[in-house]
Amino acid sequence: MKSPLKKFERTWGFLKTQHGFRRAPLLTFLRSASWYWRCLSGMATIVDLHRWNVQMFLPSNWHGFGKFIFAFRENYEPELTCLESILSPGRVFVDVGANFGIYTMVASRLVGKAGRVVAFEPSVQSFPVLQKNIALNNLENVLSFRAALSDKESRAWLYHALDPSGNSLGRDPSLDGVREEVVLKPLDSVLEENGIDRVDVIKVDVEGAEELVLHGAARSLKTYRPIIIFEYNPGCAARLGLSPDGAKDFLQSLGYEFVVLGDCAKSKNPALRPTYFNIIAIPKQSVSALVRVTHSEGNRKFSETKTRTEL
């Protein structure tokens, strides 16, 4: 068990990397205290993300990532702002590991009525919340599936974490092993079955199974050349018997370049770098998109930094 000092150091180190905390530290503490009280009283909450005209229903769970949405709002993650430079009306966004749907909601507003969002969330905990948020925002351009994506059609165990956003196909031995059986589908098959013949941006956050998802989308990647936002999570990948760099290596073989998002790209101290972070993969021929993303605040090309396994 970690000592209170170690827990504080970890929390403080995390907060210092968050753009929302640095912009408004006092407001972050006040909102966190409010969220703690809401969790004690079992009070579910709806927050407004005014920048995108989005409302988010958040279940009261102190361990859940909902507290970060509540505390940081529009500054929750730099990827949300990045969507504004790579999505526009009429485009198609695929959200793999949608959880409560914050990316789904924001993308839906950005692509408009002429566009479409396809969201996947397998968990019995999170899928009803995703559905509730779709209804809350009256989104008619979202197609949602209770399924996990992989490289082939099958079934598997999804292991629950204290925070539903950490649910994984790979078991964490430090947890109690609560699990549910979920459907696995390849993205290529789902798109074909639903007559979707365009994909512009894919976000993949599946706790280490990113490589499997991308292999199941190989035809779409080669045909549509979408921009991909994916999580680099070597610890979770190892629990699935996958290479930490498997997703990156596969995309590199398809002619993608990489941009590291946010403050993990700027940290000089390896101890303060997160053990997982997000990467944007951009087809080499999409020069304009690469320029827009690379020049966004806090981002730089992946070749200019090092992954944790290289440190």
What are these regions (language model features)?
Residues 107-112, 217-224, 251:
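Short, conserved loop/helix-junction motifs that constitute active-site signature segments
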Residues 1-133, 137, 194-196, 258-266, ...:
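S-adenosyl-L-methionine
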Residues 145-147, 230, 262:
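Short loop/edge segments at beta-strand edges and connector loops
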Residues 244-257:
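Conserved Class I S-adenosyl-L-methionine
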Residues 71-92, 139, 155-157, 170-224, ...:
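Short internal loop-to-helix segment that lines adenine-nucleotide cofactor pockets
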Residues 124-127, 131-166:
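Core alpha/beta nucleotide-donor-binding catalytic domains of modification enzymes
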Residues 94, 120, 202-204, 230:
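Active-site flanking residues adjacent to catalytic metal/cofactor-binding acidic residues
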